[in-house]
From Swiss-Prot:
Gene Ontology terms describing biological process: cellular response to nitrosative stress; nitric oxide catabolic process; response to toxic substance
Record-linked InterPro entries: Cbr1-like_FAD-bd_dom, FAD-bd_FR_type, FNR_nucleotide-bd, Globin, Globin-like_sf, Globin/Proto, OxRdtase_FAD/NAD-bd, Riboflavin_synthase-like_b-brl
Domain Globin: start-end pairs: 2-158
Positions bearing the site annotation: Involved in heme-bound ligand stabilization and O-O bond activation: Y30
Cofactor: heme b; FAD
Domains as described in the record: Consists of two distinct domains; an N-terminal heme-containing oxygen-binding domain and a C-terminal reductase domain with binding sites for FAD and NAD(P)H.
Catalytic residue positions: Y117, E157
The family this protein is said to belong to: Belongs to the globin family. Two-domain flavohemoproteins subfamily.
Protein name: Flavohemoprotein
Organism: Giardia intestinalis (strain ATCC 50581 / GS clone H7) (Giardia lamblia)
Transmembrane regions listed in the UniProt entry: none
Catalytic activity reported: 2 nitric oxide + NADPH + 2 O2 = 2 nitrate + NADP(+) + H(+); 2 nitric oxide + NADH + 2 O2 = 2 nitrate + NAD(+) + H(+)
Keyword Iron-sulfur: no
Length: 458
């Protein structure tokens, strides 16, 4: 049901009050909820609670919803009545719906259920009452507004669950997989090949760029179940998935996978999810995974069908472990287009040093045997002049600069309309986006993945 004018006005009037509370509001909300409903500690990433990434993401999303609630309600009314939605109205809300789609996929990956929205809503309203206002009319308005939003998420997440479950090799919630291969590829990165525990059964095709959620329960790690998402590095296939797991000082689950998971062990996995992927619809309107393609409301390249637009350049830009989802895209393009590829394809990678280049040999091999037109450029923050050879181990020393990538600025200036896919550490991603904006690249050609809770790059 659409929201009433009174409800909309009440929420709009208090949006700034919630924003003014800042992280104190969302920290209080999470503390209240996770204390009273400890079972949710099996769902939420507690590391993101400690570093405040999740509270910050929730605050930003909640305030954005409250400030956009009128336009969202109007759009919903048009859709419910089967009326056409003006393009300018969609454009106004593109950012909000992109974030919502990203959240819906993340929720699906951890198995969020409708009943959990009721728990979240109860604690959200209690936190508003404790920290913002006890006015009954305003609380009632927020309750209706939350129910409205929860309904949209529940409906979208059920669509995601159903689509995945109904595909060949698909499933819902979790499924057991066996570690078929485990290999160390750098000092801090292990590669895992995962196959179904039930021998001979198929796995769902992922969209190149998506991730898997790994579910771990081990008292050596935590008294609570831990869930982490890892980008799939393999090309879509019905036999196996590959992930590359990077270990850093704060990575508890990644460290567990490095130290305690061996070949033959079983892991629980959710199906592939994620709104960051290369859209590649074959003739007949089907996506690469055989499923109907979604409406292009998320940042996934949906505005361009790269199967049909064979000349559209693709630029893959990564920093550090951010190359993992882009490797899946590159492998996919190598299989789909191979030596017949006529589009320009760029692989641009920034690493700390040459020892951290996890997939150099594979990318070089793809360039030689599969995509001879692939244009590779490497930036190293630190160069060892006694060991690193320019033109072989790296191309440029220092931070990434797209202006220095041979042929890229000219391609953009010539109106070839490249699409840019980039992933990496936060500072790297801000720098890349700033460089693209300096070239006046429109948002519909900029696609990025954010590891962890979503936040704007600006």
């Amino acid at each position: 049901m659409p929201l009433s004018e009174d409800t909309i006005k009440a929420v709009e009037a208090t949006a700034d009050l919630v924003a003014a509370q800042g992280l104190d509001f969302t920290r209080a909300f999470y503390e209240r909820m996770l204390t009273r409903n400890e079972e949710l500690k099996d769902v939420f990433n507690l590391s993101h609670q400690r570093d405040l990434r999740q509270p910050k993401a929730l605050l930003d999303s909640l305030v954005a919803y409250a400030r956009s609630i009128r336009k969202i309600n109007e759009l919903h009314e048009l859709q419910e009545q089967g009326l056409p939605v003006p393009a300018e109205r969609l454009a106004e809300l593109q950012g909000f719906f992109a974030v919502a789609e990203r959240i819906a996929h993340k929720h699906a990956s951890v198995g969020i259920q409708p009943a959990q929205y009721q728990i979240v809503g109860a604690h959200l309203l209690a936190t508003i009452e404790e920290r913002v206002t006890a006015d009954k009319a305003i609380l009632a308005a927020w309750s209706k507004a939350y129910d409205f939003l929860a309904h949209l998420f529940v409906r979208r997440e059920e669509e995601i669950y159903t689509e995945t479950e109904s595909s060949e090799g698909g499933w819902r919630q979790t499924r057991s997989f066996r570690v078929e291969e485990k290999a160390q590829i750098t000092e801090r990165i292990f590669r895992f090949r995962l196959v179904p525990a039930e021998k001979g059964t198929a796995v769902a095709l992922h969209k190149p760029g998506q991730y898997l959620a790994v579910f771990v329960r081990d008292p050596r790690l935590s008294p609570h179940r831990q869930i982490r998402q890892y980008s799939i590095t393999s090309a879509p296939n019905h036999t196996y998935y590959e992930i590359a797991v990077h270990r850093d000082k704060q990575a508890t689950v990644s460290g567990y996978l490095h130290d305690h998971v061996a070949v033959g062990d079983l892991l629980k996995l959710a199906p592939p999810y994620g709104d960051f992927f290369l859209e590649y619809r074959e003739p007949g309107g089907q996506a690469a995974d055989g499923q109907p393609s979604p409406e292009p409301l998320a940042l996934h390249g949906g505005a361009v069908n790269f199967a049909a637009e064979r000349m559209t350049p693709i630029v893959l830009i990564s920093g550090g472990i951010g190359q993992t989802p882009l490797l899946s895209i590159l492998r996919f393009l190598a299989e789909k287009e191979g030596q017949a590829a006529i589009r320009p394809i760029f692989w641009i990678h920034a690493a700390h040093d040459s020892r951290a280049r996890a997939f150099k040999a594979e990318v070089d091999a793809i360039k030689v045997t599969d995509l001879p037109g692939l244009r590779t450029t490497t930036f190293l923050s630190e160069v060892d002049e006694t060991m690193d050879k320019k033109g072989e181990d790296y191309d440029f020393a220092g931070r990434i600069s797209l202006d220095r990538v041979p042929g890229l600025a000219e391609l953009e200036a010539d109106g070839a309309n490249p699409h840019y896919f980039f992933v990496g550490p936060a500072g790297f991603m801000v720098a890349v986006e700033q460089q693209l904006k300096a070239w006046s690249v429109p948002e519909d050609r900029i696609h990025f993945e954010m590891f962890g809770p979503f936040k704007p790059l600006q």
